[in-house]
A protein has these predicted regions:
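Positively charged, low-complexity terminal tracts
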Residues: 1-103
Length: 103
């Protein structure tokens, strides 16, 4: 099952910046697996953002497990890191779209 998110260039930039994991901490096997998956999502989001040539909306495709992990990651990040109004609104919109399609 695949999930599609329709994003503008600015929204794709927010997603690419938020999905980037700076300094991972590995305490167990589960965290190493999650980091590996998030790294794949980060690469996919960054390539999607870099592929924009104009400000039109494009579809960003994720597999169900990638979308689920991204939703959990964004939810956790919003609780820990403070973002501006536009970034928070964009991240909540992405979480809502993922939740609607996975439900």
């Amino acid at each position: 099952m695949k999930i599609s998110l329709t994003l503008s260039r600015d929204q794709a930039e927010v997603l690419a910046r938020v999905a980037f994991i700076d300094k991972p901490i590995f305490n167990n096997r589960e965290q190493r697996v999650h980091y590996s998956l998030m790294r794949e999502i980060t690469v996919k989001a960054t390539r999607f953002y870099m592929g924009f040539t104009m400000q039109k909306y494009r579809k960003f495709w994720l597999k169900a497990y990638e979308a689920d992990l991204l939703e959990k990651f964004i939810d956790h990040t919003l609780k820990v890191v403070e973002y501006g109004t536009y970034e928070r609104q964009t991240l909540f919109q992405i979480m809502y779209e993922i939740d609607e399609q996975l439900a």
